[in-house]
Amino acid sequence: MNLYKIKHPEEQVNFAQAVRQGLGKDQGLFFPETIPALTNIDELLALPLVERSQKILGTLIGEELPKATLDAMVKNAFTFTAPLEKVEDNIYALELFHGPTLAFKDFGGRFMAQALAAVRGDGKITILTATSGDTGAAVAHAFYGLENINVVILYPKGKISPLQEKLFCTLGGNIRTVAINGDFDACQALVKQAFDDAELRQAIGLNSANSINISRLLAQVCYYFEAVAQLPKEKRDNVVVSVPSGNFGNLTAGLIAKTLGLPIKRFIASTNANDTVPRYLESGNWAPKATVATLSNAMDVSRPNNWPRVEELFKRNGWNLSDLGSGMLSDGETEETLKAMYAKGYLCEPHGAIAYQVLKDQLKADETGIFLCTAHPAKFKESVERILSLDLPLPEALDKHNKLPLLSDEMDDDFAQLRAYLLK
């Protein structure tokens, strides 16, 4: 698999190099040089998740990894299901929260851990990543206890749910967590500064586990196929997928699936009040505002890292950006949507609720809608209980960590401090 850097296409790497490096020079994103079209979509959709995913990732990555190695990586990573649940006649929820940390990022985080272990070579590696909630838990649990891999996770202090924080800030060992006095964009900016410091990168073997790492992104492609595979065959012709969007890695993965040949008619990017992309698609003016805190905190991102990959896919495929649907919901609208969904018999959380409502508003009569449920409702226990006036029991995975003490350090939004912390 050959990849190039979107900013500077002359900088090219193979899959192993892209996994090890995470980002290119000058914070450049790596992207596959070619995405081969699959010709046997119906046969693939008839296969179980793991076997189908082995074939999809084998096609994308090519012969760089031995087939037995890649097949084992997929089997070890995808140890849980992604059920498609009917919410109403033509709308389905793809539940991506049945993994060990109850969020969609278990797919990408676990596959990346397998990939890095397979290609890392000698020497220690430091994973540095920023999280607005779910990435931290998925990465921490995927890499916890792996030899010669240290993990440092930055997150905005006071801006993620207490349960999210407990899920990844209680492990210790090779997992260090840092609460930054700033928002998620500040955390991302610190990560990017670290990657631009060549001396630091070399000294600690720096890598990233955000969706900027290609291995995470490729793993996420697989659950879009799983969604369509679970639809009745008569409903596969006009499929519309609504993606709750913050950093836009999830949407990028869906667009790669469409490029491979998965029959998805169109996508909708659904955001909260941090609506840089919906405003851009409407006006043509890229104008990020200051990030605001919302109920759907994992989407509190006003400068999405993966947007260049989205535009690259549209350009390469000859698609028109105006065909990408978008919409946003305020916190008040999100609360009303959660109540309406619960009245229909479906318990959701803020991110999934936004994706559902924007889909419902834009879905046509002859279309089948799928919205992505990216986290278990219990990960947002306080909000969901308050909005729906119910008592939400904690799943075992959350309950266990909820009883443990936080092990986080605290730091100002200051790269010099972070650099010293990483080197010690």
For each feature predicted by the language model, list its residue ranges.
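PLP-dependent amino-acid enzyme catalytic core
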Residues: 1-424
